[in-house]
Structure formats: structure tokens, C-alpha cells
């Protein structure tokens, strides 16, 4: 029995990146042998074992054979006759098909180290085309390593296009598509993920809304907010926002807010042809189709619904601001204020760029400080005054409105906080 370190740990070592997890492959063993050594078996499709002390994953060397459709239509042979090279051959990319033995020697039958040095994402074998999920994985890896200068090999991109042409992507579950997309959103350059999918024609299958935007070869002008949109600008914006925030819900909210607005602009008049309620209804359906988690959906819908209000919030009445806090349940979900502030400030700053004005004309911290002022109002004095029932709520609202009014009238403090 021999044990080898494989996969991402070796790849990241060559790239001088942090090693998150270490995966091991065991050659010449059986499940019974590992169980006798106190390993714990997990996994459904094929046996994976957790080390009794380190809890790192150990997998038996295996080969797979295509017997169905999608990324789950495989049978596995993990007998003790399977060799290390056979196991490495089934992996997606050459940079992930490198092993290291106990003496520190590298086993690299598919020239993965060379591809790491040359910054190339290359498939290991023609079997790459058997798993449609790998199309999304390669796009994600391209986004993950974009800052290092990685590119997809021409022959690999051709295979990805063939997989798409054969409608293999239709066999992927919505949940699995979202998991890969979520990981892509978590990279430093999530926009690259969508660009790769566009290049191999997968975007029209996975994200038809985004692909439709690509098909619009013109600038869209949103008269309501005086924004200029095109596909390049949207993804340039996503790239810039990703430098500001790593929150997936913030990144997702921005991307799909821009895209949805583009889809509902009349090209002849450049006017939004859908009202806010219809836009939110459409957005909810889109989130359901993509299996978007609730925490992302809530932020996205809230921003889409209240963007017009937020973009000029410093002109809104104190009463309307307090009512807005109640509508979004900010008292119990104060994190919404932070996320909406990031989104709103970013969009306003981009509007300022297109209108050639300075961002100093907009109170970037207004939303955050207004909420802090209102949130400091305590309910205890209200109770001591003998209020009960709905009277408590109404008095609390009144005091919060007055607090914001007094804060706004103090010009010195107001300007110091907001600008």
C-alpha cells in the first residue's frame, strides 16, 4: 500500500498560494484495510476515508467509466489493482493531476508542473468531455487564477464547446450549477467566470439572461437614473466591486441588478418598460430557478426594489427614511444597512464617473449614520412613561424621526459624518 499527496495542495504549493486542504490517494489498498487502520468511511458514490487523527481525506485510487448522463453518470473501479497513473488520468486538469510520495518526489505523468509554469489550464485526457460539470469548473479555475495570468488551452476550449454543443450541460442540476457559480463569485475576478462561459457558448444554456445582454450590441441608457450600460461596463463594474467587497450577496446583487435593468429597457425610447413590483417578481423567479440562497436573494431584491430611493436618500424625508428601515427590518437585520450602503455608494460613484462629477457631492455615509442615530433610541423611557400596545410603536417611530431631524439640522456634525 502506498500513499500520495495529490490535487490542489501540490498545485497551490507551486503557485505560492495557501493550502486549504490536503487530499491523499491510496494505491494498492482496499476499504477493509483502511477500516482496520481506524479510518472512517464517508461518501456515497465511492469510498472516501477520514484519517483517524488529522481528519484529512484519503481516497482509494480509482478509475471511472461513463454509464449515464450528467456529472453523476459514472461507475467506479477502486480495486487494489488501479495504478496511480490511472487515477491521475481521470482528473480534470493537468495542474490537478500531480502527486507527491512520502519522500517528496513528484509524479507528473501529464506535465502539470510545466503547465503551472506556463500558466495554462489544460485537460488531462479526452475523458474530460464525459463530465459536463468540468465546463463550469474550468471557468471557475480561470476566474480563480486570473490574477496569476492563467489561460485556457485552445484544445481544451474546443472540447468545452463540443460539450456545450452536445447539450450535456442540460443534464446538470440547478443546485450543482449554483455551487460552482457561488465558488466563482468568491474569487477575486468573478467576471472572468461568465466571460469563459460566453466564449465556449455555455452562457446561453446556464445563464440565458446574461447571454441576452451580450447579444445587445449597443449602449443602453436608463433615463430614470442617467446610467449608461453595456456588457463590458457591467462586468468591469463587477471587477471593481470585487476589490471593494468579498461578500457574495453584494457581488451578485450588483451584477443581476444591472442585467435585469438592461433586459427591460425599450431600445427605441431608452425607458424602463417594467415597474418596480414586476421587476422584483421577475427577480424572485430568477433566484428560484438558480437555487439562489435566501440570504443572497433578500439583499438582491431589497437593492433592486429600493435603488431609486437609496440613490437620493439624502433628499428623502426623515419619516420616509424611518419607514424604509422598518420595511427592510433593519432593527433586527442591521447587516442589511451595511450591504445596501456598499452597493449604493458603489453605484452612485459609477454614476458620477459617467456624468463626470465628483463623488464628494454625495453623502456616502448617510445611510449608515442615519440608521445609527435612529437605532440609539431606546424603548425603556417609553415604557416608563406608561405607553402600551401600539402606542409604544408610534412613540418609538416619532422619537426616531425626531432624532434624525435633529441630527440633520446639526450641519457641522452632519457634514463630518456623511461626506
From Swiss-Prot:
ATP binds at residues 8, 11, 91, 137, 140. Disulfide bonds: none annotated. GO terms for biological process: RNA repair; tRNA 3'-terminal CCA addition. It catalyses: a tRNA precursor + 2 CTP + ATP = a tRNA with a 3' CCA end + 3 diphosphate; a tRNA with a 3' CCA end + 2 CTP + ATP = a tRNA with a 3' CCACCA end + 3 diphosphate. Its cofactor is Mg(2+). InterPro entries: CCA_bact, NT_sf, PolA_pol_head_dom, PolyA_RNA-bd, tRNA_CCA-adding_enzyme. It holds the Pfam family PolyA_pol. Keywords: ATP-binding, Magnesium, Metal-binding, Nucleotide-binding, Nucleotidyltransferase, RNA repair, RNA-binding, Transferase, tRNA processing. CTP binds at residues 8, 11, 91, 137, 140. A single active site specifically recognizes both ATP and CTP and is responsible for their addition. It comes from the Bacteria. Mg(2+) binds at residues 21, 23. It is an enzyme of class 2 (transferase). Its EC number is 2.7.7.72. Catalyzes the addition and repair of the essential 3'-terminal CCA sequence in tRNAs without using a nucleic acid template. Adds these three nucleotides in the order of C, C, and A to the tRNA nucleotide-73, using CTP and ATP as substrates and producing inorganic pyrophosphate. tRNA 3'-terminal CCA addition is required both for tRNA processing and repair. Also involved in tRNA surveillance by mediating tandem CCA addition to generate a CCACCA at the 3' terminus of unstable tRNAs. While stable tRNAs receive only 3'-terminal CCA, unstable tRNAs are marked with CCACCA and rapidly degraded. GO terms for molecular function: ATP binding; CCA tRNA nucleotidyltransferase activity; magnesium ion binding; tRNA binding. Belongs to the tRNA nucleotidyltransferase/poly(A) polymerase family. Bacterial CCA-adding enzyme type 2 subfamily. This is CCA-adding enzyme.
